[in-house]
From Swiss-Prot:
This is Pro-thyrotropin-releasing hormone. Residues 63-205, 220-242 are annotated as: Disordered. The modification Proline amide is found at residues 86, 116, 137, 154, 188, 229. Residues 91-105, 168-178 have a biased composition (Acidic residues). Residues 69-79 have a biased composition (Polar residues). It comes from Homo sapiens (Human). The lineage of its organism: Eukaryota, Metazoa, Chordata, Craniata, Vertebrata.
């Protein structure tokens, strides 16, 4: 590409000479040589300008390519997050929050990456354990005492445990009470009259007979242990009838 000064010099030479043909050719060559000698760095300057323009175009092109690449990366990350499981996204967000808390100095909770329902179950279980921990059996809730036993007959549940005792046990208890307190549940006047001594302190035949009958009934009751009460009553009646 010829320089502008060179073109101007050629135009001036042609205009000034005004002579056709080869008369003006040696003069034009001389003028070109003079201009080249006067401006030796003009061509170099133009070449540098061209290089700078070329570099500028390359830089702009590279910037455009980088912008397109970054936009494609953003689109790809959005696409990946869109096609990802929602639970994994939540876990990643929780991880980011936990990392921020660790950086700020906050302690991470014990329920890291745990199902919310399990957290509630464990919390209620821990509350129950703390409530019943080291507790006296008598101080526990009263409804536990009335709780229905597991796999038990409904009639047996409602029945009184004292009423389930056998008649033999009841007879044994009655005999023990009679041995300890033979005159229990008896009128005090009858005890005084039925004793070996009368109300005036005299011993009679009736008092002796009653004392003997009491002794016999006690001895027979001891021998006839665990016997039906009706049979025992029959043995007691025999000496009376005689």
């Amino acid at each position: 590409m010829p320089g502008p000064w060179l073109l101007l010099a050629l135009a001036l030479t042609l205009n000034l000479t005004g002579v056709p043909g080869g008369r003006a050719q040696p003069e034009a060559a001389q003028q070109e040589a003079v201009t080249a000698a006067e401006h030796p760095g003009l061509d170099d300057f133009l070449r540098q300008v061209e290089r700078l323009l070329f570099l500028r175009e390359n830089i702009q092109r590279l910037q455009g390519d980088q912008g397109e690449h970054s936009a494609s990366q953003i689109f790809q990350s959005d696409w990946l997050s869109k096609r990802q499981h929602p639970g994994k996204r939540e876990e990643e967000e929780e991880e980011g929050v936990e990392e921020e808390e660790e950086e700020e100095g906050g302690a991470v909770g014990p329920h890291k990456r745990q199902h919310p329902g399990r957290r509630e179950d464990e919390a209620s279980w821990s509350v129950d354990v703390t409530q019943h921990k080291r507790q006296h059996p008598g101080r526990r809730s009263p409804w536990l005492a009335y709780a229905v036993p597991k796999r038990q007959h409904p009639g047996r549940r409602l029945a009184d445990p004292k009423a389930q005792r056998s008649w033999e046990e009841e007879e044994e208890e009655e005999e023990r009470e009679e041995d300890l307190m033979p005159e229990k549940r008896q009128h005090p006047g009858k005890r005084a009259l039925g004793g070996p001594c009368g109300p005036q302190g005299a011993y009679g035949q009736a008092g002796l007979l009653l004392g003997l009958l009491d002794d016999l009934s006690r001895s027979q009751g001891a021998e006839e242990k665990r016997q039906h009460p009706g049979r025992r009553a029959a043995w007691v009646r025999e000496p009376l009838e005689e």
